[in-house]
């Protein structure tokens, strides 16, 4: 037996290693050499070839396969003992080597057994193509996540594509062929003989467990997952990975692989989070807390605190913490759809779902516990997770891991305490609100007999609501009773299943109570009923509002404050669950984080063949825009944002989404590898002036700076695809309406224009109103050099010499056209379009810029109307007090327009006495600058 330094720690701890070296003295020299290198996939492939023999056939006979795999497993296990305990191998090497071993073992055993069966029965064939059909072997759990421990079971699910039969002389159905294959394959891996075993195998994660067939068709799996799939199965399928196993020449399982992934992803990761699932996940957490194995261990006299997998603060609790966020958020955040635990934890940290410090502590705990788990298993090659109770053995374990006994115990206790506390708070950490030591939300009792409630049940709830309405809404009782009757009589409600109806019956009284406590009870009640009727067919949202009273109260406050907000929520109920964690809605939008996470999520939207899933990407961008806008809306309604700050934020969000759109669309139109887009997206109008509202269109112009011969065609195509990407109505709605009419020559012009052509047009052919529009234009997204060049061109155009009298006539004429296009025949004051309104301020500002930018270059900057008026006043172009008063008036008019929009008013009009002072100030500004014109003329030489 060797006692060389690389072996010292391993020999001191592992009785299994000592016995193997005693029995095979020549093994020491081989092991010393093997331990000098990481146990990589290439190393395992070389060992496999060596153990198979130089003349081995491509497919080994079953008995030869059995022996080779057991010897390969011993090589891997012994090498890892020495490298791991000697501090040479990190966790990634250990679990990676065991996973590669499992992939080799399963693939090799499959080929050997399949060849033996095919020799008798022929090949199973695909019905559609006649090609040989492979069995799909799915690795579950740690095998799927590529994180096997050194003495792990492997969980497998066996699947196949088409039903049919084999093509040999003794034909059997494909179903029977794969069942026999599975039955014969398992002993090759798991049977213990003189050489040991390769892996214990477990097939119980297949549909119906031990009661189900050994191999399932994909169609049968689909029916099972849709009809019977449970929450713990979502948890199980999260890590599921198709293993690299191919037995038949000329087979092509790619289509079946794509079909499998198209089943797995929506089953595990749901876009619309199901709050039934939330209750099931809570139950799963309790099952982990009170696992029957812990109780069994306690009954056997073993202290369950010594179990580092199942005990408090153990490995399974870390897995639950990480996977809970994946299950809750992964449907909307594809970047979280990772099989490996540490990969997923890193993605959650990057997404801001787990604080940096917590993520680091969880990772440190996981690495410590996994390394300890492996050390326990190295000792006697046993699948154990129990720490030794004997102090001497415990000290030996600490030494094997490189710790003094006291330091080991302290580190272990610190890690487990942190994991245990985090596990108890797992749902709060995942953004689902509740402190997890508090009781779960009360669940609505189910109808005991399971029958659909009869008309009497409808009558009962209507009577109960009538009494509540008469008490809490006496002045509007008649109207609200009529709305209640239409709601309960609607087809959506009458066709509800029992569980949803019971939720509705619990929700409606709670909704009335919440509405009664708002500033506008009747409005809130009617809008809540509209929302409830819209979401009635989605039991998840009924559950959310019925079981989270704080969330219902928040919804009531929002819809009471703004009918526009009520309509927005009704159109996008996906946003409701963001109200659970109210605090996060009031955090400032971190646009850098939004951009990083959006890019990561879009990158993860892939079809099974690796190509981008464009439909998912488009929907995801719409969902992100809705979520960010809703966050701003919540802050807006609570008075946390000024109108200017809100517009800045909405404009920054649009810029971000435009930039991401270029990145996603460019590869779809460009055919030159490595070429970058030299496109600048120029924002005009509200986006250009950073005055965007919640539902504003985007006025855009596409400019390019590229000398390639196909540039005009390429960038026109890019512009078309971008416009489609932004404005197409998908299942998640439309991102933005896009207006391209401000480009040179308008609708008659090219969709994308070179910067040279744009400059020439602006100098020689543009109308004065186009120069007015240019005062509010800015580079918004795309190539920064092209954007900078546009800004230089814009500045040059704005400082061109102009005939002031002619310009004044053009501006006045254009203002008259605007008025004619927005006639107001009412007695009300139109805040935007009437004389003394916002348009007057904007026209005056544009006129001042075009007249005076040449002599006052500060006016070239696109700073917004209020700032530009102030600068004009400071420069003496208009009286400074008037400039400040007009800026204040414009701010007030914008605020009034915004409040009216939130109230759902299409046209921002107010009684003539309202805003009279502001209107008078704007009229004075207009008269001073454009009617008298004296100041402007005096300043222009």
From Swiss-Prot:
Record keywords: Lipid biosynthesis included? Answer: no
Q: Which reaction does it catalyse?
A: [glutamine synthetase]-O(4)-(5'-adenylyl)-L-tyrosine + phosphate = [glutamine synthetase]-L-tyrosine + ADP; [glutamine synthetase]-L-tyrosine + ATP = [glutamine synthetase]-O(4)-(5'-adenylyl)-L-tyrosine + diphosphate
The UniProt entry, under PANTHER family, shows: BIFUNCTIONAL GLUTAMINE SYNTHETASE ADENYLYLTRANSFERASE_ADENYLYL-REMOVING ENZYME, GLUTAMINE SYNTHETASE ADENYLYLTRANSFERASE
Region Adenylyl removase: what ranges?
1-431
Give the start-end ranges of region Adenylyl transferase.
Answer: 447-941
Cellular component terms per the entry's GO annotation: cytosol
Q: Which HAMAP family does this chain map to? A: GlnE
What Gene Ontology terms describe what this protein does at the molecular function level? [glutamate-ammonia-ligase] adenylyltransferase activity; [glutamine synthetase]-adenylyl-L-tyrosine phosphorylase activity; ATP binding; magnesium ion binding
Q: What does this protein do?
A: Involved in the regulation of glutamine synthetase GlnA, a key enzyme in the process to assimilate ammonia. When cellular nitrogen levels are high, the C-terminal adenylyl transferase (AT) inactivates GlnA by covalent transfer of an adenylyl group from ATP to specific tyrosine residue of GlnA, thus reducing its activity. Conversely, when nitrogen levels are low, the N-terminal adenylyl removase (AR) activates GlnA by removing the adenylyl group by phosphorolysis, increasing its activity.
Q: What is this protein called?
A: Bifunctional glutamine synthetase adenylyltransferase/adenylyl-removing enzyme
Q: Which GO BP annotation is one of this protein's?
A: regulation of glutamine family amino acid metabolic process
Q: EC no.? A: 2.7.7.89, 2.7.7.42
Q: Which InterPro entries match?
A: GlnE (IPR023057), GlnE_rpt_dom (IPR005190), NT_sf (IPR043519), PII_UdlTrfase/GS_AdlTrfase (IPR013546)
Its EC top class is transferase
Which cofactors, if any, are listed as required? Mg(2+)
Q: Which UniProt keywords apply?
A: ATP-binding, Magnesium, Multifunctional enzyme, Nucleotide-binding, Nucleotidyltransferase, Transferase
Q: Which gene encodes it?
A: glnE
């Amino acid at each position: 037996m060797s006692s060389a330094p690389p072996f010292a720690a391993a020999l001191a701890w592992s009785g299994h290693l000592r016995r193997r070296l005693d029995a095979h003295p020549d093994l020491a020299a081989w092991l010393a050499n093997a331990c000098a290198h990481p146990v990589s996939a290439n190393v395992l492939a070389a060992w496999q070839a060596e153990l198979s023999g130089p003349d081995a056939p491509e497919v080994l006979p079953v008995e030869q396969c059995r022996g080779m795999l057991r010897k390969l497993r011993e090589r891997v296990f012994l090498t890892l003992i020495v490298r791991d305990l000697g501090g040479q191998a990190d966790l990634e090497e250990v679990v990676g080597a065991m996973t590669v071993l499992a992939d080799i073992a399963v693939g090799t055993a499959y080929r050997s057994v399949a060849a033996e069966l095919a020799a008798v029965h022929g090949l199973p064939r695909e019905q559609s193509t006649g090609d040989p059909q492979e069995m799909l072997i799915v690795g579950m759990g740690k095998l799927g996540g590529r994180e096997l421990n050194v003495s792990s079971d492997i969980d497998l699910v066996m699947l196949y594509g088409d039903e049919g039969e084999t093509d040999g002389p003794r034909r059997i159905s494909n179903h029977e062929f794969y069942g026999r294959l599975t039955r014969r394959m398992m002993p090759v891996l798991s049977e213990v003989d003189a050489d040991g075993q390769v892996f214990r195998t477990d097939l119980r994660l297949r549909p119906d467990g031990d009661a189900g067939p050994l191999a399932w068709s994909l169609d049968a799996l689909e029916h099972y997952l849709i009809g019977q799939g449970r929450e713990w199965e979502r948890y199980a399928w999260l890590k599921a990975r198709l293993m690299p196993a191919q037995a038949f020449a000329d087979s092509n399982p790619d289509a079946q692989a794509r079909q499998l992934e198209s089943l797995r992803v929506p089953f595990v990761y749901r876009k619309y989070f199901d709050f039934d699932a939330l209750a099931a996940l809570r139950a799963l957490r309790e099952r982990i807390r009170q696992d029957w194995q812990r109780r069994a261990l306690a009954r056997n006299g073993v202290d369950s605190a010594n179990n580092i997998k199942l005990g408090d603060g153990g490995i399974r609790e870390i897995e639950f913490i990480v996977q809970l966020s994946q299950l809750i958020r992964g449907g909307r955040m594809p970047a979280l759809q990772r099989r490996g635990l540490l990969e997923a934890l890193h993605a959650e940290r990057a997404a801001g779902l787990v604080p940096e410090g917590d993520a680091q502590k969880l990772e440190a705990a996981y690495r410590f516990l996994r390394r300890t788990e492996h050390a326990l298993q190295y000792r006697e090659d046993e699948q154990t997770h129990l720490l030794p109770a004997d102090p001497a053995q415990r000290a030996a374990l600490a030494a094997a891991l490189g710790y003094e006994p006291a330091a080991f115990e302290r580190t272990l206790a610190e890690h487990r305490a942190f994991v245990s506390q985090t596990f108890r708070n797992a749902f709060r950490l995942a953004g689902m609100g509740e402190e997890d030591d508090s009781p779960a939300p009360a669940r609505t009792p189910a109808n005991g007999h399971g029958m659909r409630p009869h008309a009497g049940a409808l009558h009962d709830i209507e009577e109960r609501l009538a009494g509540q309405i008469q008490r809490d809404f006496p002045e509007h009782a008649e109207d609200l009773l009529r709305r209640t009757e239409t709601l309960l009589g609607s087809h959506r409600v009458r066709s509800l299943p029992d569980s949803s109806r019971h939720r509705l019956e619990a929700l409606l009284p709670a909704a009335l109570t919440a509405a009664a406590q708002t500033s506008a009870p009747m409005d809130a009640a009617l809008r809540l009923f509209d929302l409830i009727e819209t979401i009635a067919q989605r039991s998840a949202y009924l559950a959310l509002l019925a079981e989270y009273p704080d969330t219902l109260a928040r919804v009531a406050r929002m819809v009471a404050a703004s009918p526009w907000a009520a309509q927005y929520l009704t159109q996008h109920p996906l946003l409701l669950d963001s109200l659970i964690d109210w605090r996060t809605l009031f955090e400032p939008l971190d646009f850098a984080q939004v951009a990083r996470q959006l890019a990561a999520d879009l990158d993860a939207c892939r079809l099974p063949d690796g190509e981008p899933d464009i439909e998912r990407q488009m929907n995801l961008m719409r969902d992100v825009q809705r979520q960010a806008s809703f966050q701003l809306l919540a802050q807006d309604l609570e008075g946390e944002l000024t109108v200017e700050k809100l517009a800045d934020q909405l404009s920054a969000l649009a810029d971000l989404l435009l930039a991401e759109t270029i990145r996603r669309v460019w590869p779809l139109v460009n055919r030159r590898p490595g070429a970058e887009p030299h496109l600048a997206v120029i924002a005009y109008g509200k986006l250009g002036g950073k005055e965007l509202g919640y539902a504003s269109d985007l006025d855009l112009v596409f400019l390019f700076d590229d000398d390639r011969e196909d540039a005009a065609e390429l960038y026109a195509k890019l512009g078309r695809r971008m416009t489609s990407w932004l404005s197409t109505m998908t299942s998640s709605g439309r991102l933005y309406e896009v207006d391209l009419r401000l480009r040179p020559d308008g609708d008659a012009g090219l969709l994308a224009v070179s910067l040279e052509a744009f400059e020439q047009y602006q100098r020689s052919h543009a109308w004065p109103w186009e120069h007015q529009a240019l005062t509010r234009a800015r580079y918004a997204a795309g190539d920064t050099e092209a954007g900078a060049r546009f800004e230089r061109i814009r500045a040059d155009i704005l400082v061109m010499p102009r005939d002031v009298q002619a310009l004044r006539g053009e501006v006045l004429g254009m203002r008259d056209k605007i008025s004619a296009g927005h006639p107001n025949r009412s007695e009300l004051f139109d805040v935007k379009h009437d004389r003394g309104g916002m348009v007057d301020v904007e026209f005056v500002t544009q006129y001042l810029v075009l007249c005076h930018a040449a002599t006052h270059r500060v006016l070239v900057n696109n700073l917004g109307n209020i700032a530009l008026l102030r600068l004009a006043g400071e420069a003496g172009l208009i009286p400074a007090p008037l400039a400040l008063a007009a800026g204040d008036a414009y701010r007030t008019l914008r605020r009034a327009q915004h409040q009216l929009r939130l109230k759902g008013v299409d046209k921002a009009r107010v009684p003539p006495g309202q805003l009279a002072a502001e209107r008078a100030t704007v009229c004075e500004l207009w008269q001073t600058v454009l009617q008298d014109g004296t100041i402007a003329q005096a300043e222009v030489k």
